[in-house]
Amino acid sequence: MGKNKKKTGKKAKSHPHVEDVDETVNKPEEIINSVNVTVPPKMSTDPEADGIVASPDDEGKDLSEGVDKQKVNDGLTVDTINPLEDKKAGDEMKELREEIERLKLELSHKKDQETPNEDFKNELANVIKERDEFKTQYDTLLSKISSMKSIFNKMKEAQKQLEEVQEQLTEYESQNLKLKKKLEATKTENSELQSTIVTLNTELENLEKEQESTEEVFLEYESRIEALEDEKHDIIEKHSKELNTYRKEKDQLNLQVQELMIILENNKQDISDLRTERDELRQALESHEKEKAVLKNSLNDLELKIEEVDNKREEEARERDQEVKSLRSQLDTEIETHNNDTEALESMKKQLEAMKEDASMKEKYEEESKQHILQIGKLRHEAIILNEHLTKALAMLKKSSDSESVDKELISNLLISFVSIPRADPRKFEVLELLSNFLNWDEDKKQQAGLISNNESKNSSAVSRTESFVSLWTNYLEKESEKD
């Protein structure tokens, strides 16, 4: 009982009181996890033989055997396993290496925490023997791995052995289920052990006091251990080359872990800063949203009023625009049809003159002239219909329009028609008169344009100036339609 108290007291110094018992109870879970990763071909399933809490030495032996046999099985199935299984085997090797390093650390930790009594030497000797056995097992493991390289070429034998391994795996799965049942039993015992934590804590406090007195004696034993380690150093040098590779990998992993920890700390600081900024922004957003809600209410009221006014104006403008657009389109089509008719008539006249000269082609030209006459009749009929529509639209426009404004397209059409009409045609004078009324020319400009002479300018005062531009425009269109 005294030995157990001293051991638990040393563990209490390096770990918290509550975590000590949890660590001893959770060791079966680690053993089961190692079995799941690297299942040895032979494992005792006797529940009485297996302890609930395995000692570090037993764990080291079991793990070394598991490593040995798992590496052999991995060597047998290298050529037949797919790339995913190769990756899994590599992961298992890494886990085995980590288990070996952990066991070494536990052994060194155990050396540091051993009590200075007569049993210490025996236990130290046992630990050294176990370490030597572990090293011999490790050497045998390496020799077996090197010997298995020659077997890789034998694919048929490897496949047979793979089938045997698969059968063993089924057995191991059944053993794994048994171990899981043991784990459940350990969990129940864990609940019972937690009840004893209070009593153990009191004992640990007493043991800590005893430990302080034994530390001085422990220093002497450490000096003796150092002498033994010097003797051990010659043996370790043989394995230093292989261990250096593992240490380099471990150092690289430690550096990566440190870098990741630094990155995590920086990220935590950044996250805290961002959270404070987010809270400030949320407060500002809430205040802005309140102001925005007030402004939205006022804006909605204003927008409703503006929409009502705009809708009224848009409806009026649309009606006027539609009327003007319809008039423009009709006017443009009328002008185009009129120009086409004039061109067709001129071409027909030329053709008729040519037909008089060529008597032999008379019949052919007569048929063509008849077709053209029919087309001209159709075009005139369409022009009459369009003129009727125009007169009706202009009459409606004359009634509805109060303003004397006309857009730029109308002015451009008037100018084009003025330029295209020949000088002898009286329509040119009418178009010029429309432009003068639209642009509100005075008498001087009209005289310069040739609309009125000096005598007519005196009599122009008697003419009524109240006649609007729209009325002149409608009269002009009516005259054009009558001529057509």
Swiss-Prot record:
Q: What superkingdom heads the lineage?
A: Eukaryota
A Gene Ontology cellular-component term:
Golgi apparatus
Region listing for Disordered, in residue ranges: 1-75
**GO molecular function terms here?**
GTPase binding; small GTPase binding
Q: Where is the composition biased (Basic and acidic residues)?
A: 16-30, 61-72
Q: What is its main location?
A: Golgi
Name of the protein in question: GRIP domain-containing protein RUD3
Gene behind the chain: RUD3
